[in-house]
Amino acid sequence: MSTRESFNPESYELDKSFRLTRFTELKGTGCKVPQDVLQKLLESLQENHFQEDEQFLGAVMPRLGIGMDTCVIPLRHGGLSLVQTTDYIYPIVDDPYMMGRIACANVLSDLYAMGVTECDNMLMLLGVSNKMTDRERDKVMPLIIQGFKDAAEEAGTSVTGGQTVLNPWIVLGGVATTVCQPNEFIMPDNAVPGDVLVLTKPLGTQVAVAVHQWLDIPEKWNKIKLVVTQEDVELAYQEAMMNMARLNRTAAGLMHTFNAHAATDITGFGILGHAQNLAKQQRNEVSFVIHNLPVLAKMAAVSKACGNMFGLMHGTCPETSGGLLICLPREQAARFCAEIKSPKYGEGHQAWIIGIVEKGNRTARIIDKPRIIEVAPQVATQNVNPTPGATS
């Protein structure tokens, strides 16, 4: 995969100091309410929440509600289920077009975590910052919308509506909806002892985008310049941006091919938080143990140099539009990892076996000294794919 031409504000008649990420104080899915707080807030919704499976012509129609990536609701007309999710994030990169693509990929990822590969409809939720000038709004927001639209089209769906409001911070998100037969989705609750855990995107996106901003902040750059070069940071940033914009659709399809038992996507709670949430949903008495952490090259060293302020080694560092964490039969996992790299799926797809499923009490943990897998950037050095609509 090639790098994009860097977004140049002056090409859009904007001040050269324009930065999209300055229109928010939080980044990406770092906006999530902490898990323990969220669970308390949702208690009243869960008290009377009917979540038992239903029957249709003798077949079980699964139901999934509050607590996981999507809802799965059996429809009144029988034999079909509504699978739906909503999500939104704040700007994490300064390229508006790519930010739109990332926001769309992030919404769709919740469907893909269910093994759903076809989305019937999308809505876009857009918060336009009231701190933007008219020129900034009129130049930047259409690029974001175009990126969102293009990613939706790549996913085989379309944006048919939504809501746009004024807000102090820019907000980007949407709703993804599909109607499925039971064989078109995989319930996230069937992991068994002996399964292995597979991850389909490297960790460290939040670190990469943060340290990229530090290039302009000498007091912060001085903390890490002995462990990373400016070129390392630029490559990690480009790799993070491309990974976040990449759909998890291929992995969702391969979940069916290789008999996945459960999955979730890795976003604002970090890999450990999402692994713990997935473990709680299991029907069997199992626990997840993570031994390996695939991380964007040099970002583990950066995290350590910062006193692990990002929580990367502890698995608590937020990710935005991260990969899928999939429970696969041991005998299928290596084949999954090999297949997803096939050129027929396009460039950039990767996967790693990172842990095991063992008999336990529905918890997840990372071992004390996990193996760090340094994931080299796949982006090329040339610049291609300029942002649509730029003036020369």
Swiss-Prot record:
Gene3D superfamilies: PurM-like C-terminal domain, PurM-like, N-terminal domain
Coiled coil: none
Binding positions for ATP per the UniProt entry: 32, 67-69, 87, 110, 161-164
Active site residues according to the UniProt entry: 31
Cofactor(s) for this UniProt protein: Mg(2+)
Regulation of its activity: Activated by phosphate ions and by potassium ions.
Cited InterPro entries: PurM-like_C_dom, PurM-like_C_sf, PurM-like_N, PurM-like_N_sf, SPS/SelD
GO biological process: protein modification process; selenocysteine biosynthetic process
UniProt binding sites for Mg(2+): 69, 110, 265
Catalytic activity: hydrogenselenide + ATP + H2O = selenophosphate + AMP + phosphate + 2 H(+)
Cellular component terms per the entry's GO annotation: cytoplasm; nuclear membrane; plasma membrane
Phenotype when changing residue 85 to A: Strongly reduced ADP hydrolysis
Cofactor stoichiometry and binding remark: Binds 1 Mg(2+) ion per monomer.
Similarity section: Belongs to the selenophosphate synthase 1 family. Class II subfamily.
NCBIfam families: selD
Protein name: Selenide, water dikinase 1
Gene name as annotated: SEPHS1
